[in-house]
Amino acid sequence: MYNAPMAQDMSYYEHVQRRHEEKGCLYACIFTALCCFCCYETCECCLDCLCCCCN
C-alpha cells in the first residue's frame, strides 16, 4: 500500500483566503498589501489576491 502524503505548507493564496474567512475582507486586503510592502515588491500573487480577496 501507499503511505499517506506528507503534510504540506499552506500556499500564500490559501493563507489569504483563510484570513478572509476568519477575519473579513478588509483584514485580508491589508495582510496582502503588507506582504508586498515587507518584501519591497509587488508580485503577481499579491495582485491576484488583492483583486480576488473580496470575492
Swiss-Prot record:
Name the InterPro entries on file.
Answer: CYSTM1_HM_Tolerance, CYSTM_dom
Topological category with respect to the lipid bilayer? Single-pass membrane protein
GO CC terms in record = extracellular region; plant-type cell wall; plasma membrane
Q: Which UniProt keywords apply?
A: Cell membrane, Cell wall, Membrane, Metal-binding, Secreted, Stress response, Transmembrane, Transmembrane helix
One GO term under biological process is: detoxification of copper ion
- Briefly describe its induction: Down-regulated in root tissues but up-regulated in shoot tissues in response to cadmium (CdCl(2)).
What sections of the protein cross the membrane?
Answer: 24-40
From the Swiss-Prot or TrEMBL record, what is one GO molecular function term?
A: metal ion sequestering activity
- Localization annotation: Cell membrane; Secreted, Cell wall
Major subcellular location class: membrane
Q: Which cysteines are joined by disulfide bonds?
A: none
Expression (tissue specificity): Expressed in roots and shoots.
Does the UniProt entry include the keyword Lipid metabolism? no
**Keyword Cell membrane applies:** yes
User: Can you tell me which family this protein belongs to?
Assistant: Belongs to the CYSTM1 family.
Tell me, in a sentence or two, what this protein's role is. Confers resistance to heavy metal ions (e.g. cadmium (CdCl(2)) and copper (CuCl(2))) by chelating them at the plasma membrane of root cells, thus stopping their entry and reducing their accumulation. Binds to aluminium (Al).
Name of protein: Protein CADMIUM TOLERANCE 1
Gene that encodes the chain: CDT1
